[in-house]
């Protein structure tokens, strides 16, 4: 049995690009006022992760409001390939605040009590760990002062006093570490669940995006963006709960102790250190983000170039363009290298600046502590405690700097992933859409207008009727709209105007799942997965048994061919089916179609790439399957002799049906179809109207 994941359609809010940014003064407003208490510095700094990691849009901008309120409901026309790029939101328009807002729903998910309990438990454990952690300097002070003042006492009494303090110190250290590790373990499930949910949602959204998007984007860059984005999610989630909150709490507690125990001079140095450290980190990291974006862009281009050349390996070889492909790849790698050198150099500058700020503060505090001992205002234990508190402050500060830096990098990595989520799905189900009720499979196009490019209409008032159970064909010159009819019937695109009906039911009022389930297609170039023949045939019906798959292959007259392979149905077909012949690929497509068993069959130039003998054999096979099935079958063909026996032949010209009828009726008209027939029958493709039909 084959296993598949069910697909379902999801919707996404429209993303409206906007170019408006928060005033730079607002970015560091929290650090500008010198009289703000240290605790206010610390608590407000934690908001940088969500509000100031990226420039925000101006709240007065109408486009920005439309993005958040999703009030824009007007229907967009189908776009040109040039306009396609504008439909894909620029990743710079996705701000850190948007990403954090999206991520919060995964940290505190609705309807998942077990995950919420884990979040609360993790927060409780981190508070307990930090409370125990700040006890360590007190124990150090107590040990030093006790030993300094009780040396004249008996050794037993000294050990009794100091031993109790040492045990307390050990208890605080051990359980602080235990609580931290328990917190990490408890929160791991929340983090991994969020990564799975985000990745699944983005992938599902990509599957439901319009054909426009997939025709205009490089697969390599999309997969690379998803890979970087999921790694960024892991870091952001762990940072928000496991780093930002505990770091903020620890800085607040250490600053409060310094203020309470040693007065405003020590607290002023601590506050100034935190402020300067945060300001320097934010400014420098903002500057470094540009280099990270450049590295990501080069990385995506290199990945896309490599995947594209490997997919088209045969073309690379036949045109002897290995050196050209290598030069393309090397060009992107060179850009990636240069950007990463800038990232590394700017990181060295950031680390040096942070070390200078902290070391200066440590030196000042130690000087003040020594002076306090000389004046008998402080004890040696106080000096040790100050030293411990300052180093205790250094740990969260260093973490805060590195976490902020890594969060900015993670946000940059996640920009494109979340921009993919915000791409609008143009083809959507109506809120009151109903399942298609088939009554034979009649198809009607009523004055349909459609264009991929507004300057180049494809269908221009196209109208026709296909009776239920009929065998029909569409013919015409390349670009007249034959394959477009199939795409519109599948609702890969919506019409610009006009109606399409199946059994008198409008397509835009039918659920997409029931519509696409009712139609099967054998395309000109059959898309095959790099998997076994069994898997590829079974893709027509993921629930089919192996016996049903074999039966479909027998009906398509390919079972004996498959059995002749050394591995039979377990034979791998290779990338895009390149390891089997064209005729075998098309027979696999017919097998897949039979397994799906739809009511409407489409053959989109299914034999155009085959040799004459293979084409005739496959057509005989297809005709045998259609006879007696009472299914509506539609053929699109360039070779008119392959559709000569159709009940109705529609001749398309300039996006309209200009002639219709059987082969004999159309030949009797001696018009467009007749000219096409004689042109193909002539040895050199020249029209010969004097010949017999």
From Swiss-Prot:
Membrane topology of the entry: Multi-pass membrane protein
Keywords, ordered alphabetically: ATP-binding, Membrane, Mitochondrion, Mitochondrion inner membrane, Nucleotide-binding, Transit peptide, Translocase, Transmembrane, Transmembrane helix, Transport
Stretches assigned to the ABC transmembrane type-1 domain: 119-409
Positions of transmembrane segments: 119-140, 164-187, 237-260, 262-282, 349-367, 383-404
One cellular component term from this protein's GO annotations in UniProt: mitochondrion
Record EC number: 7.-.-.-
Transit peptide limits: 1-28
Enzyme class: translocase
PROSITE patterns: ABC_TM1F, ABC_TRANSPORTER_1, ABC_TRANSPORTER_2
Subunit structure: Homodimer.
Annotated PANTHER family: ATP-BINDING CASSETTE SUB-FAMILY B, IRON-SULFUR CLUSTERS TRANSPORTER ABCB7, MITOCHONDRIAL
Official protein name in the record: Iron-sulfur clusters transporter atm1, mitochondrial
Organism: Schizosaccharomyces pombe (strain 972 / ATCC 24843)
The gene coding this protein: atm1
């Amino acid at each position: 049995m084959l296993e598949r994941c069910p697909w379902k359609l999801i919707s996404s809010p429209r993303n409206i690009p906007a170019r408006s940014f928060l005033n730079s003064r607002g970015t560091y407003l929290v650090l500008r006022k010198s009289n703000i208490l240290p605790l206010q510095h610390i608590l407000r700094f934690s908001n940088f992760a969500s509000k100031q990691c990226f420039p925000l849009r101006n709240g007065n901008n109408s486009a920005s409001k439309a993005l958040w309120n999703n009030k824009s409901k007007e229907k967009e026309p189908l776009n040109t390939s040039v306009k396609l790029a504008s439909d894909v939101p620029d990743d710079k328009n996705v701000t850190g605040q948007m990403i954090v807002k999206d991520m919060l729903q995964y940290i505190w998910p609705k309807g998942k009590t077990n995950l919420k309990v884990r979040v609360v438990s993790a927060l409780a454990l981190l508070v307990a760990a930090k409370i125990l952690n700040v006890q360590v300097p007190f124990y150090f002070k107590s040990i030093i002062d006790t030993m300094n003042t009780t040396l004249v006492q008996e050794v037993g009494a000294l050990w009794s006093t100091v031993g109790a303090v040492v045990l307390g110190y050990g208890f605080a250290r051990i359980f602080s570490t235990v609580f931290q590790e328990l917190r990490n373990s408890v929160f791991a499930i929340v983090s991994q669940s969020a990564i799975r949910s985000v990745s699944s949602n983005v992938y599902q959204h990509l599957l439901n995006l319009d054909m426009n998007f997939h025709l205009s984007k490089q697969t390599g860059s999309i997969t690379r963006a998803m890979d970087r984005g999921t790694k960024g999610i892991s870091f952001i989630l762990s940072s928000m709960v496991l780093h930002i909150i505990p770091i903020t709490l620890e800085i607040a507690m250490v600053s409060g102790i310094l203020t309470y125990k040693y007065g405003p001079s020590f607290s002023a140095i601590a506050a100034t250190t935190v402020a300067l450290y945060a300001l320097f980190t934010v400014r420098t990291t903002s500057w470094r983000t540009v280099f990270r974006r450049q590295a990501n862009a080069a990385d995506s281009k290199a990945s896309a170039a490599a995947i594209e050349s490997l997919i088209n390996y045969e073309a690379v070889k036949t045109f002897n363009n290995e050196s050209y492909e290598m030069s393309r790849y090397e060009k992107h790698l060179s850009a990636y290298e240069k950007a990463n050198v800038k990232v590394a150099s700017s990181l060295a500058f950031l680390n040096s600046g942070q070390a200078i700020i902290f070391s200066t503060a440590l030196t000042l505090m130690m000087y003040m502590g020594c002076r306090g001992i000389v004046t008998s205002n402080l004890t040696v234990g106080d000096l040790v405690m100050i030293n411990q508190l300052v180093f205790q402050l250094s740990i969260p500060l260093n973490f805060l700097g590195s976490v902020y830096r890594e969060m900015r990098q993670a946000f940059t990595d996640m920009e494109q992933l979340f921009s993919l989520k915000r791409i609008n799905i143009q083809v959507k189900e109506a809120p009151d859409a109903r399942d298609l009720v088939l009554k034979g499979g009649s198809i009607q196009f009523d004055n349909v207008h459609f264009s991929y490019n507004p300057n180049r209409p494809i269908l221009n008032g196209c109208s026709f009727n296909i009776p239920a159970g009929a065998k029909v064909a569409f013919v015409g010159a390349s670009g007249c709209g034959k394959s477009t009819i199939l795409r519109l019937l599948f609702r890969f695109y919506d019409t610009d105007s006009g109606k399409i009906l199946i059994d008198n039911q409008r397509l835009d009022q039918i659920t997409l799942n029931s519509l696409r389930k009712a139609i099967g297609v054998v395309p000109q170039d059959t898309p095959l997965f790099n998997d076994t023949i069994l898997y590829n045939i079974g893709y027509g019906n993921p629930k089919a048994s192996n016996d049903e798959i074999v039966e479909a292959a027998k009906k398509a007259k390919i079972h004996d061919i498959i059995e002749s392979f050394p591995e039979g149905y377990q034979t791998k077909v290779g990338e895009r089916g390149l390891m089997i012949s064209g005729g075998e690929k098309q027979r696999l497509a017919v097998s897949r179609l039979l397994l799906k068993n739809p009511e409407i069959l489409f053959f989109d130039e299914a034999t155009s790439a085959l040799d004459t003998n293979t084409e005739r054999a496959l057509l005989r096979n297809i005709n045998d399957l259609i006879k007696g099935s009472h299914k509506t079958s539609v053929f699109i063909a360039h070779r008119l002799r392959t559709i000569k026996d159709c009940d109705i032949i529609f001749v398309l010209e300039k996006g309209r049906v200009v002639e219709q009828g059987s082969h004999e009726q159309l030949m009797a008209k001696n018009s467009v179809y007749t000219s096409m027939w004689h042109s193909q029958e002539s040895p050199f493709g020249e029209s010969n109207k004097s010949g017999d039909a």
